[in-house]
Each structure stands twice: as C-alpha cells, then as structure tokens.
C-alpha cells in the first residue's frame, strides 16, 4: 500500500510540474502598450526595439546576431527563459498584422557602422527617399538575393524596422545592413573616393548595352519624383531600363522595387560572365 501511495504522489507531482511548464502566462497591459508603441518609429527609437512576427522569422532571429528580448507565442512553438506562452485571443490583441500570427518577438535594433573603405569593392544600393514600407521590404529582400550586404538610405526613407518592412523582407533584414545618413553627402564621398555612382534616368544609357562595373553605388529614387537633383548631381553613370519593344508607349514608369530587381539582376549577370562575381 505504501508503494502505491508513493507512486500516486509522484504522478501528482509530475502532473503539477508539467502544468507549470506549459501553463499560459498572463499578458500584462504594459506588454500590449509596449508592442503598440513599437508600431511607431518614435517608440522604436525610444525603446531600441522592433517587432518581428511569425514562427519562421523568429526561428531565424534566434540563431542570428540580433538580440531577442522577449517572445510571445502559442503553446508548443518555442521554449526558453525569454518565451511567454499566450493564448490565441492574446495573440490577436498583440499582433500588428491584419491576420494575427502565432508568435511575436521584441528584438533589439542593431547599429551598424558605415565605412566607405569597406564598400569600395562591393555593389551597394542607395535609396533616395523610398517611402513605401512594402517597396523598402522588397528591396531589402532583393539585395539579399543578389548578395548585396549594405543599403544606404536617405533619412526621409521608410524605416527598415517598421513592422510592414520587417515582414516584407521575409528574413532578409537579418542579413542586409540598412544605414540612414545624409545621402547627398554619402554620394559625394563615394564619388570623391572614385567609386562609380550609377542611377536610373529616362535619358540614361540602355542598361543592356552598357558595360557595368562590378562594384559601386546604385541609386534608386523616390516612388513619385525619382532621383532628386541633389543626388543626381553626384551620379557618374546614368542608366535606363528600356520598354519592349523600344519606343512603345505604355506605363509611364516602373515601380521602384521592380526597377531595383531589374537593375541588380543585370549588374550581377554581367559580373558573373565578365568578372569574379564577388562584388
């Protein structure tokens, strides 16, 4: 009888342990207020954090160089001291997406140095007031695909840690360094250092007939007005993406993210056929 009693006590103790291990935590009002604050750039700057959502992205974040401060997740997705298990209704209250995700992480915003010497042998994108979060997120993803590790943005460009941008990058934000600076000053320094500064213009040279450098700066302009006069003054090579067939009147312009994809593809195509393909 004593043995049976001990077995019952052990079963009860194990059951309690399992319950404590898997029990849902109580999400506080402060948690919700913090996540809501991080939807705004001012809040992200104040707290030094950004929001990432979804099991795949958060899984990548946990193995990256970025610091994950806290994870809110449905039961069974993640484990660790930074993980708080919440229910579906709580996730719906927390999520910044239209359709609530199964997990949300608070991640420390990284700070990268911008070294012109390090960029000398690479292809780098420069964004002149690209303001749509979806466009910026797509461009970061394109940069990652084409092996471009740095994007230099004007200070009026969209914030790369905006939740919409983070989601649109599909994890590429972990591998591409995005810098914000006085773009005109940066481009002047690049030109003075002898780096080719290329940009897309309607009066530019047909990109498919141009001999493109393996390394340099590629400037992409604002969604509405294109490349500003200040940035254009530093461009040493004007390029043009022609329509097909040549001279046909159709759409007035290309979406900046689409144009960036075409330009990057042609730069990398030429690098892979004529050079080392390492820029």
PLM features: what roles do these ranges have?
Residues 63, 111-204:
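RNA substrate-binding interface of SAM-dependent RNA methyltransferases
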């Amino acid at each position: 009888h004593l043995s049976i009693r001990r077995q019952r006590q052990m079963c009860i103790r194990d059951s309690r342990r399992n319950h404590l291990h898997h029990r849902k935590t109580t999400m506080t009002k402060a948690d919700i207020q913090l996540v809501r604050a991080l939807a705004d750039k001012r809040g992200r700057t104040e707290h030094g954090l950004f929001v990432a959502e979804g099991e795949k992205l958060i899984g990548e974040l946990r193995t990256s160089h970025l610091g994950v401060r806290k994870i809110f997740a449905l039961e069974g997705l993640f484990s660790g001291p930074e993980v708080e298990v919440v229910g579906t209704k709580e996730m719906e209250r927390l999520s910044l997406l239209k359709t609530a995700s199964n997990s949300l992480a608070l991640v420390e915003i990284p700070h990268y140095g911008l070294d012109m010497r390090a960029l000398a042998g690479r292809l780098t994108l420069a964004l002149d007031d690209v303001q749509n979060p979806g466009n910026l997120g797509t461009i970061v993803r394109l940069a990652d695909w084409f092996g471009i590790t740095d994007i230099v943005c004007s200070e009026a460009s969209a914030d790369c840690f905006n939740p919409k941008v983070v989601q649109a990058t599909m994890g590429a934000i972990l591998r591409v360094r995005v810098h914000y600076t006085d773009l005109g000053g940066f481009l002047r320094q690049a030109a003075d250092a002898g780096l080719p500064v290329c940009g897309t213009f309607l009066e530019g040279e047909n990109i498919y007939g141009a001999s493109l450098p393996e390394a340099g700066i590629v400037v992409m302009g604002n969604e509405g007005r294109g490349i500003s006069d200040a940035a254009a003054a530093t461009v040493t090579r004007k390029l043009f993406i022609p329509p097909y067939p040549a001279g046909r009147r159709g759409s007035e312009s290309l979406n900046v993210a689409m144009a960036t994809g075409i330009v990057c593809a042609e730069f990398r195509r030429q690098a892979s056929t004529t050079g080392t393909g390492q820029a």
